[in-house]
Amino acid sequence: MVKFIESELVLLKKEIDEMWTLVYNQLDRAGDAVLTLDRELAQQVLVRERRVNAFELKIDSDVEDIIALYNPVAIDLRFVLAMLKINTNLERLGDFAEGIARFALNCHEPALDTELVKQLRLEEMIAQVLSMLELAKQALQEESQELATAVFAKDNMLDEINADATAILADYISRHPESALSCLNLVSVLSLIHI
């Protein structure tokens, strides 16, 4: 019995790794789609979101099966529940990627103002989120509390960047009222990126 649950836990961790990679790629594509307003790339993110949702359901089902069939206790139960929580959060990040891609798909501007992107530090925010995801995955794989703690430091940097965004956008809207709708929609993108 112990050997069976161990193999199931290894498979579950492998599935979480695959889901993590899928969501990372979704966020990366969505970020690129926003920065370039590439509607085709944004559409790819929307199409792949169905795969993220299906994968989440499969992992949920696998977790239920492990609990029902093997009745894990102690460390195994904590591991299974942690994988369930990670799976839920990854699916939520996939939803955020979809929301970011929708902005790129529905934006009426031909391109984002490069100066605005620079002031908002949008590229830096996207890179920071992707870095946080990589670091969190590495922390899980290596079971490193130190790496997990480093994710929080990166989150503080995102907070700092995001804190200035509203004032920057308000100033931009006052100087470019024709872009007000896109700027207001960009606020929601920033909140999604800020996760």
Segments the model singles out, each with a brief description of its role:
Residues 1-193:
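Cytosolic, long alpha-helical scaffolding segments
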